Amino acid sequence: MARYLGPKLKLSRREGTDLFLKSGVRAIDSKCKIDTAPGQHGARRGRLSDYGVQLREKQKVRRMYGVLEKQFRNYYKEAARLKGNTGENLLQLLEQRLDNVVYRMGFASTRAEARQLVSHKAIMVNGQVVNIPSFNVSAEDVVSVREKAKKQARIVAALELADQREKPTWIEVDSSKMEGTFKRVPERTDLSAEINEQLIVELYSK
């Protein structure tokens, strides 16, 4: 499946919630009618079957983290192999993606922008350049912006924007050095309560 390149707000309207695909300079409800389905007339959302609800939740999380269908299914399979709660394992694996960590640290205003920074070799992990967005970040790994990329306007702007957001408790960031430490894997209580990962588990368990 190809990566979606269309309007980002349309995806958030489709899922009925902010997927954090835009920079966050303005509240998303000031940009579009988030509670209204996409389309010229904002058709009413029909009642979904159990399968439809499960599918929508999977699509919501997949789009939020910017992961393709095949990748997402592979994450689920890995989560199912690990000990503990499969749904929680899935969210933790997604949170450990390098592009997500770069976003969480505030070096990018969106996960898509973070993915681009990683792909363009602007990011280092423990002093080594890593250009794989799906790279798995481990506890105590140090993620930093390469020296030659530190003056990029988008990174400076993203850090200013990040100062307005609540800081993740599992990450420590030194904005002046453009460097952060992934202190630990987040627990379920650290993450969004708007995600119902059990619906995704039920979908893939069929």
From Swiss-Prot:
SMART domains: Ribosomal_S4, S4. Pfam families: Ribosomal_S4 (PF00163), S4 (PF01479). Residues 96-156 form the S4 RNA-binding domain. One of its GO terms (cellular component) is small ribosomal subunit. GO terms for biological process: ribosomal small subunit biogenesis; translation. GO terms for molecular function: rRNA binding; structural constituent of ribosome. Keywords: Ribonucleoprotein, Ribosomal protein, RNA-binding, rRNA-binding. Part of the 30S ribosomal subunit. Contacts protein S5. The interaction surface between S4 and S5 is involved in control of translational fidelity. One of the primary rRNA binding proteins, it binds directly to 16S rRNA where it nucleates assembly of the body of the 30S subunit. Belongs to the universal ribosomal protein uS4 family. This is Small ribosomal subunit protein uS4. It comes from Alteromonas mediterranea (strain DSM 17117 / CIP 110805 / LMG 28347 / Deep ecotype). The lineage of its organism: Bacteria, Pseudomonadati, Pseudomonadota, Gammaproteobacteria, Alteromonadales.
